[in-house]
Design a protein with these regions (language model features):
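Contiguous, non-catalytic segments that form substrate-binding/exosite surfaces or channel walls
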Residues: 80-175
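N-terminal helix-rich structural modules
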Residues: 1-107
Length: 175
C-alpha cells in the first residue's frame, strides 16, 4: 500500500488506504504474535546447530521482531499504522504547500508513539537508546557521544585553520 500511495494512487484515496491499513495491521499483528510462531522460533533456536549461518541470523532477527512486536498492545500497533498512513498524506500536501504547521500535529503523535514503544521495548533504557537499538543494534547514546566528541576534537581545529587561510580570489568566476 505504501508503494501504491507514493507512486500511482490518487492523493485523495488516503482515507480508504487508512481503513485498509487498519485491517491489514490487525492481521499482521495477529500473525506476527501468534503463539505458533513462538513455538517455531523456539524449535529453531533449540536446533541452531543444524542451521546454516544465514538461517541462524534470520532466526535471530525474527526472534527480536517477534519479542518487540509482542510488547506493543495490538490497538496501539494498529493505531500507529493508521497514523503513519494519515501522516504521509498530510506531509505530501504540507510539503507542496510549504505548510509545516499542518504536518506538526502528526509528527508530534508519531514521536509520542515512538516514546511509548521505547518504554515497551526496554523501560530501563533511555527512550532514544531503546529506539536506536532497533536500527543500530548495540549502539547507544554513550557510544555516540564519545564518537562525536572525538570527531569534534579533530574537526574544530581543522575549521579554525581553514578560516585562517586567506580567501582565494574567485572574482573571475562572476564576470
Amino acid at each position: 500500500l505504501y508503494l501504491d500511495a507514493t507512486t500511482a494512487a490518487p492523493s485523495d484515496t488516503w482515507e480508504g488506504r487508512g481503513k485498509t491499513m487498519e485491517i491489514m495491521s490487525e492481521i499482521t499483528y495477529k500473525l506476527s504474535t501468534d503463539p505458533e510462531n513462538e513455538k517455531l522460533l523456539s524449535y529453531l533456536e533449540a536446533n541452531r546447530d543444524e542451521l546454516d549461518d544465514q538461517t541462524k541470523r534470520e532466526v535471530e532477527v525474527l526472534r527480536k521482531d517477534f519479542d518487540q512486536t509482542k510488547k506493543i498492545p495490538a490497538e496501539e500497533y494498529i493505531a500507529y499504522s493508521v497514523l503513519q498512513n494519515d501522516a504521509q498524506a498530510v506531509w505530501e500536501k504540507a510539503k507542496n504547500e510549504n505548510d509545516f504547521a499542518a504536518f506538526a500535529p502528526y509528527l508530534e503523535k508519531i514521536v509520542d508513539f515512538n516514546r511509548k514503544f521505547a518504554g515497551y521495548y526496554n523501560a530501563d533504557m533511555k527512550p532514544y537508546d531503546a529506539l536506536l537499538n532497533e536500527y543500530e543494534e548495540g549502539l547507544n547514546t554513550q557510544t555516540l557521544d564519545a564518537f562525536f566528541a572525538q570527531l569534534r576534537s579533530a574537526i574544530v581545529p581543522l575549521i579554525a585553520k581553514i578560516k585562517e587561510v586567506p580567501q582565494i580570489d574567485d572574482s573571475f568566476l562572476y564576470k
